[in-house]
Design a protein with these regions (language model features):
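Short amphipathic alpha-helix with an adjacent loop that forms part of the alpha/beta core around
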Residues: 79-85, 146-150
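Short alpha-helical segment that forms part of, or immediately flanks, the ligand-binding pocket
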Residues: 80-81, 105-110, 125-126
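Nucleotide-sugar-dependent
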Residues: 91-103, 119, 125-126
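Conserved acidic donor-binding segment of nucleotide-sugar-dependent glycosyltransferases
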Residues: 134-142, 151
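Conserved catalytic-core segment of nucleotide-activated headgroup transferases in glycan assembly
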Residues: 3-75
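Conserved donor-binding/catalytic loop of nucleotide-activated donor transferases
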Residues: 86-89, 107-114, 130
Length: 189
C-alpha cells in the first residue's frame, strides 16, 4: 500500500440549540397564542426561543429572549439583520388569517431562516410550498411533534462517529480541552 494510516474516531458533540423566532406583532391573529404553546411544549435545553418586535416585556414574560425590531426607530437594526445576527434557524409564522402578503415571511426568507407555518396562513403557506423553505402544519401540536423529531434527527447527525487519519496532525481535531485527538485512541471526549 502507498499509505499506512491509523483510523481513530471521535464523537462530534455540538452544544448549540435550535433557535426559533417569532417575528412581528404580538397578536392572536398572528399566532402568538400558538407560539406560547410551542414554547411550553418544547425542551428549553434543546431550543432557544426569540421574539423579534417591540413587545419586549410581554415576550420575555412568556419565555422568549427579546430582540427589539421597530421600523419606526431609525437607529435599530432591521428584521433581516437581527435574524442573521441572532442566528435564527427557524421562523415561526403562524398567521390564522389568509395572508395576502407577509413582510415577515420575506424577511425570514432573506435571512436564510427555515419557516414553520399553519396550513391556513394564506400567502405564507403558498410561498413555503413554492420555495421549499419550510413546513406547513394543521396544528401547533403537529408542529411541536415535528420539531421534537427534528431535534432528535439533528442529534443523530451531530453526535456521530467521525473517522480520521490519526497520523496527520494537520487534520486531527482538537478536543474541547485543546488536546489533540490522535493521542486519545479508543477514548471519546
Amino acid at each position: 500500500p502507498h499509505l499506512n494510516y491509523n483510523v481513530c474516531s471521535y464523537r462530534k458533540q455540538w452544544k448549540e440549540k435550535i433557535r426559533l423566532g417569532y417575528l412581528g406583532f404580538v397578536s392572536d391573529i398572528k399566532g402568538y397564542s400558538e407560539w406560547k404553546k410551542l414554547i411550553q411544549s418544547l425542551d428549553k435545553n434543546r431550543f432557544d426561543f426569540f421574539y423579534f418586535g417591540s413587545a419586549i416585556e410581554e415576550a420575555e414574560s412568556d419565555g422568549a429572549k427579546s430582540v427589539m425590531v421597530d421600523f419606526n426607530c431609525p437607529n435599530s437594526l432591521g428584521m433581516v439583520e437581527q435574524l442573521k445576527k441572532n442566528r435564527i434557524d427557524i421562523a415561526f409564522l403562524w398567521s390564522k388569517c389568509q395572508e395576502t402578503y407577509s413582510y415577515t415571511y420575506y424577511e425570514a426568507f432573506e435571512a436564510g431562516c427555515w419557516i414553520v407555518t399553519s396550513t391556513h396562513s394564506g400567502n405564507i403557506t403558498d410561498q413555503v410550498l413554492k420555495n421549499g423553505n419550510g413546513r406547513c402544519f394543521d396544528t401547533v401540536e403537529d408542529c411541536a411533534t415535528f420539531l421534537k423529531k427534528l431535534q432528535g434527527d439533528i442529534d443523530v447527525l451531530r453526535i456521530d462517529d467521525v473517522k480520521i487519519n490519526c497520523n496527520t496532525d494537520d487534520f486531527a481535531p482538537q478536543s474541547f480541552g485543546g488536546e489533540n485527538m490522535k493521542y486519545r485512541r479508543g477514548k471519546r471526549p
